[in-house]
Amino acid sequence: MNGIERIGEYFLLMGRVFRLPDRWRMFWRQMSKEMEKQGLQSILITLIVSVFMGAIMTLQTKLNTENPLLPAYSTGLVTRDCILLEFSSTILCLLLAGKVGSNIASEIGTMRITEQIDAMEIMGVNSANYLILPKIVAFMVMMPLLVTLSMFMGLLGGYGISAITHVLPISEYLLGIQYAFIPFYVWYSFIKTVIFAFVIASMASYYGYYARGGALEVGKASTKAVVNSSIVILLLDVVLTNLMLN
């Protein structure tokens, strides 16, 4: 199957997904489970990566911008903008594409090869809507919360490395993360995150839904979901940055 056929198949699947659920109670129940699985179970890795990346950004920025012409607070300013504009949205989504995306693809793919999806279709259930819609909506709801947590922990990581290593006075770091703050950067990050969350969940669901064969094919589908969604995220990042910040 060539790329154009895959794109068409993807949009046809999304047409089946985005329909009103037959049973709203079941939808909310499934969505709450997915929010826990995709969001709450991703908090720990988000905390760890964000703290260390914030610390590394602060350390690298300070050590590589030793210039008497640059004010000391510029390190905090650069760290803040890097975290708000790219790390907590794009890089975190790339990270979670591997965790959440592969999980979604393997879960749906396993249901496909064990003929559970076929059984749903025989019973007249819209399997695409029942299985995929709660996953997409749940991830789009949880990602902005994870991004907010990532922003806070990233800035906290920079504060921590400043306090521990004394590479930068804490007062200068705090001044830097407050200096010339642009609130739109936060909204820009949230908008990107919601779009990226949709890409991750929908593409992972697509590759899992159309998996064929056995366990090996499910593994290949998971790999394709992660790789291709990561590529699409990077392409969209360029487009959205040009549209929203240019």
At which residue positions do the language-model features occur?
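Active-site cofactor/substrate anionic-group-binding motifs, chiefly glycine-
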Residues: Q38-I91, L95
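Selective transmembrane-helix segments that form parts of the transport pathway or gating/packing helices
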Residues: G39, I43, L47, F87, ...
